[in-house]
């Protein structure tokens, strides 16, 4: 079954939208002003200043390396040989969360995050003649935050190559990859927009604000309808004390996606800092409403409670998560662990059985078996 509460939640949201009005309607959003940079730099940033990174470009040494990978084989066989070489550590990339790089930079520096690794792999796979595309895994977005507790959005991206023999997923951390999540193919432009946004946030963290803006604006030039990118631009303006521009950026994100909880949370913080408590409370309540109907938010709340030994609270959150979405094995496995900790061994067995029935990833199944073996051996 899917999201059981979707229809009910939609009705409640519509009714709530009629009865709960914004305390004071903010000023209209001006996207052109936000994208000009005038709010922070005093004058518009010229289009000629925007970056044009050669994201998928191959360095000569990359072409040389790939030319020697099963040169006489078919494209999918060449890709398989490339990946086998990675597994045997013929070539390695060290994970760095704050390193969004081009394909050539990733290859030369041998470091990068999931975006950098995926960019490199897509470029390499296509050079070998294999079909390859960017794939967004619809896990709950990763919420980073800067020193002022303003949330920003990162999405998990990997590579998919399809052939008549099936679908091959290439992920920086394939052991943790889980096909239970919805996934969708991204166009190159969609992936590039996320690349530029990531790099913009990295420049922001380093205090290089003009570089940060150039990259964030470039991302929105590619995908002006992406609410995540507007929320990240808002975080940039907030970081620099440009509250009106931050407010408008978050409101633009909400115009594009009325359930964007990160934009809501950032508006709440912004209004609270400005002592506009009525507006702050309004957006806090809106964010709470949507989060508490998100089974993944409930799951992460339950996991946090479990890790802190609050098993009763974990059980309450998991019951709500499973009621809303019962096809995620992790919900059932954690409920099994929680029930076991509470001494409810019969129910724990039921939940563990359900978890294993939903798993279709051998690596996950092995990980669960190891956890259970460890649990049973503990006094």
Q: Positions of the model-derived regions?
A:
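Secondary-structure boundary elements
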Residues: 44-104
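Long, contiguous interaction/recruitment modules in multidomain scaffold/adaptor proteins
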Residues: 94-230, 235, 239-240, 244-258
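Canonical tetratricopeptide repeat
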Residues: 198, 232, 266, 300-301, ...
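Conserved structural position within tetratricopeptide repeats
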Residues: 220-221, 251-255, 285-289, 319-323, ...
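TPR alpha-solenoid repeat register
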Residues: 229, 263, 297, 331, ...
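Terminal, low-structured helical/coil segments at or just beyond the last alpha-helical repeat
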Residues: 333-379
């Amino acid at each position: 079954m899917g999201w059981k509460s979707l229809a009910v939640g939609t009705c409640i949201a519509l009714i709530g939208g009629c009865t709960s009005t914004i305390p004071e309607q903010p000023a209209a959003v001006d996207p052109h002003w936000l994208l000009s940079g005038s709010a922070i730099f005093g004058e518009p940033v010229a289009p000629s200043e925007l970056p044009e990174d050669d994201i998928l470009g191959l360095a000569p040494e990359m072409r040389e390396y790939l030319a020697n990978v099963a040169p006489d084989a078919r494209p999918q066989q060449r890709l398989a040989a490339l990946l086998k070489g990675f597994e045997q550590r013929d070539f390695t990339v060290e994970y760095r969360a704050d390193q969004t790089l081009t394909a050539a930079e990733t290859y030369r520096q041998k470091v990068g995050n999931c975006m950098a690794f995926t960019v490199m792999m897509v470029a390499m796979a296509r050079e070998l003649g294999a079909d390859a595309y960017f794939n967004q895994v619809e896990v709950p977005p990763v919420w980073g935050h800067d020193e002022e507790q303003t949330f920003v959005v990162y999405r998990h991206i990997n590579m998919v190559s399809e052939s008549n023999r099936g679908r091959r997923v290439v992920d920086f951390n394939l052991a943790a990859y889980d096909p239970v999540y919805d996934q969708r193919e991204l166009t190159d432009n969609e992936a590039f927009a996320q690349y530029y946004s990531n790099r913009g946030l990295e420049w922001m963290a380093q205090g290089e604000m003009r570089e940060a803006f150039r990259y964030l604006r470039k991302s929105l030039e590619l995908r002006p309808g992406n609410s995540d990118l507007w929320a990240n631009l808002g975080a940039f303006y907030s970081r620099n004390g440009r509250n009106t521009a931050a407010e408008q950026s978050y409101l633009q994100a909400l115009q594009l996606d009325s359930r964007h909880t990160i934009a809501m949370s950032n508006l709440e913080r912004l209004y609270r800092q400005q002592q506009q408590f009525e507006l702050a409370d309004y957006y806090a309540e809106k964010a709470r409403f949507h989060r508490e109907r998100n089974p993944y938010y409930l799951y992460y709340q339950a996991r946090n409670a479990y890790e802190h030994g609050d098993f009763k609270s974990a059980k309450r959150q998991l019951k709500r998560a499973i009621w809303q979405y019962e096809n995620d094995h992790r919900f059932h496995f954690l409920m099994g662990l929680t029930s076991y900790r509470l001494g409810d061994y019969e129910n724990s067995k039921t939940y563990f059985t359900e978890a294993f029935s939903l798993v279709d990833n051998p690596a996950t199944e092995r990980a669960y078996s190891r956890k259970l073996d460890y649990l049973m051996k503990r006094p």
